[in-house]
Amino acid sequence: QFLAFYRRRPYDITNVERHPAATIIDAKPRGRGIRPRPGAFAVISIKRGGLREPHPFTISKVGPEGEVQFSIRGLGDYTRRLRDRVEVGDKMTVEGGYGRFDYAKGRKDQLWVAGGIGITPFLAFADSLTEAETRTIKLVYCVTKPEEAVGLDRLRAAERRCKGFELDLHVSKTDGRLTAEVLADKVPFDLARAGLWFCGPAPMRTALLSGLRKLGKYPASVHFEEFEFR
């Protein structure tokens, strides 16, 4: 409990974007901010009626002075209420970062798979990639419609900056369902020797992993992040 209090920092909300797929909130610290690693999550509490209850969300962007961004999909009562009520200037507390979803400790060849708003940790991952990155990383970002994609400018910037990183935007409305067979065909390396990093709906993860096992292409390591906070 003391550690949680120590990690809790006051923030001001500086920007709110109501994107078709998510409510994107930017905030800056009042004083010392948190210093999370890419892919971490934080517990936030917004000082506005109906939004004070603490909820955990993955941090989709980390700034040099402790600034943070959250990209939050309306999955339940709280997140839909947040979309309706949150405003620039609102005060919030941010506690974190937490979690073990950390690509930096992974294998040389990595497949990142994002389903919908599950892109959030991968946005922070991509921001952290540099020209010196030696891994080969393939990101398959699955959305239903093109307008649901979040942060494409940041992902494409990472693709230009880092020669080992490649983005594949899979739009299921036009490209069809993302099956294990389709996924395996997109990968430029041996999946059986690679690491898989997944964030998205649990049924999607189960179907893909089951399919990859049947294909004899089950990854050497599997890491996944739960994000369906309501």
Where do the model's predicted regions map?
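Ferredoxin-reductase
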Residues: 4-93, 143-147, 156, 172-174
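FNR/FR-type flavoprotein reductase catalytic core
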Residues: 1-7, 74-230
